[in-house]
Amino acid sequence: MGKVVIFDWGGVIMHKHPVDNNDRQAIIRTIRSFNPNLTDEEAWDVYTKTLIDENGIYISRQDDELSKIKWVDRINRVGNFNASVDEFSTRFIAEHLKVGYYKELVDFIHFLKDICQIGLFSDLIFCCAPVLDEQVDLSQFDYVWLSYITHLRKNTEEVFELVEKDVQVSPEDIMFIDDTTVNIENAKKRGWNTCQAFGYELDKIKDSIEKFIGYKLESESNGKKM
């Protein structure tokens, strides 16, 4: 079935703290829109302290309505405001649509579709899905693994097994691009090819993929060769 190139989202495609116009700033704006008395650090703490419930479950990364309600209720309680799931989701999406992303890399990813299979593999909450789709057009991807759907995070061996089961290729025919060391190390343990990079390191990403597929890539995008 050939080769598969798999991309992370945050940091690789979307701007991630401390890069300007990043996801953390969007989260802070979201929380403070419901309670403007919070400082930026307090707003960030509201978010980070409510991602996991008392049983250690990432309720923010579940797809069922009960988990969504439970998560937003926790945010309301810790942040001292009262937003519905729809209100919070709408604001979260609106603020994240303002976040920068690496458009040139997205163009390159779409170009790769004619050469190999492409996948997206990311830990994210349900509110992020519309933003992700707006940035990358999920219909262009052969595979999409999002933690709020798989209920597995990239720090678990099970999710890597799921990816391998879905793609049905040997580990040496998988290339994984991620900005986080632990995710890269987990992929290496499986025998995957890896490239640890941020989205602004397009040349590094391209070089790694060229070595992976075994030849030089050339295409036209916005008048520039890829």
Residue ranges and their predicted role:
Residues 1-7, 125-226:
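Asp-based, Mg2+/Mn2+-dependent phosphohydrolase catalytic module
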Residues 1-49, 189-190, 201:
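Active-site neighborhood of HAD-like aspartate-dependent phosphohydrolases
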Residues 19, 96-102, 152, 202:
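Acidic-and-aromatic substrate-binding clefts and catalytic sites of carbohydrate-active enzymes
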Residues 22-30, 46, 70-74, 91, ...:
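Alpha-helical elements of Rossmann-like donor-binding domains used by nucleotide-donor carbohydrate transfer enzymes
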Residues 84-133:
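Substrate-recognition element of Asp-dependent hydrolases with the DxDx(T/V) motif
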